[in-house]
Amino acid sequence: MSEQRILVVSPSWIGDMVMSQTLYALLKKHDKEIDVIAPAASKPLLSRIPEVNRSMLFDVGHGELRYGYRRQFARSLRRNNYQQAIVLPNSLKSALVPFLADIPVRTGFRGEMRYILLNDIRLLDERRLPRMIDRFMALGLPAMAPLPEPEQPRLTVDKRNQT
């Protein structure tokens, strides 16, 4: 059986991107092939996360809609045949690309009226998922599944850049 292809819509902030590595480690343990879309500020970090197969620049500034760009970007993703998208940010705009790309399963937490855009909507229970890493990992598992112990985020070092 081939690996399941998953698209992750990454967080915009560097700290959240580092924490998202726990999700990528969990997905990789379950034989998922992981592609990630990220803004320019955090995309370089993805080259240091070994579980990520491919990172793609999503060139939309924080708060910008740029619907035409999102639609074109989504169309370019269709040929990748993703089976699932995991949307880490809680904004309506962050869920647009997976919807427009016709990805069959679109997972994320409820927020900002995303009912049409997501079809695997999770309710956030802050007592069950108190930490951001818990929330990210929960989106990579079936709803209400018990969480495994998270791996510590670890980034690879580029030996060429060391002096």
Question: Where in this protein do the model-derived segments appear?
Answer:
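Catalytic machinery of carbohydrate-active enzymes
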Residues: M1-T163
